[in-house]
């Protein structure tokens, strides 16, 4: 079957028919959500997956909460109008911390969010020092501090907010090399500590894409913890117990918000993740 880039108004070649499968949307502002999708797909390979990324408003980390909520609701609504959804995963820490209540109020399918894996990190740490690596927005939000107070109040939490690491992860998926010097500069506050964190929470879904490089830069033995596997297990449970019967026999598809040259360059990456086509999604506003 041919695989094509598609504009929103361009007809596509029909996918080879298959058995209808529950339709699951994985959404992020960029491509970081692919790390979460990969965990879900590993556990649940036989679903109909849609990946949507907002390359118009990326990155969300510096946007206002009102903007993020309105934007995420608009995009999920547009996808739902094309494909009835059994479940949606907001695979973006920034969007999850602010948009889940609005999404759950509007839609009758389950909506799963991503939160920093502070609870498991607090259990894993040996020296009691946990690093939280996230966007500046996630580091500053009260929700993050509530998680720390609830699950890690006996740990020393060292937080680093970085928008640059999001850009490095996006560049890696575009085929560019990741600068270890840049990572060392970002992580310098920890690397200079007499006793640095022995467990690091990857509090942005982009950051697992940089796991290999992070392990080269951080002290030997540092544990990296993210939410991907837990999100996959939660998705499996909800699909079995609470999701509506929304299925499709279509091939997996990815949506961008603007068909830019940069988005087109992602097609080979998306194909490796199992998405047949990349199409522009028409979004109001």
From Swiss-Prot:
> Which keywords are on file for this protein?
Cell shape, Cell wall biogenesis/degradation, Isomerase, Peptidoglycan synthesis
The residues listed in the UniProt record as binding substrate, with positions renumbered to this chain, are: 28-29, 60-61, 93-94, 205-206
Q: Which GO terms describe its biological process?
A: cell wall organization; peptidoglycan biosynthetic process; regulation of cell shape
Quote the SUPFAM superfamilies the UniProt record gives.
Aspartate/glutamate racemase
Q: What class of enzyme is it?
A: isomerase
* NCBIfam families recorded: glut_race, PRK00865.1-1
Please give the name of this protein. Glutamate racemase
Q: Which organism is it from?
A: Escherichia coli O45:K1 (strain S88 / ExPEC)
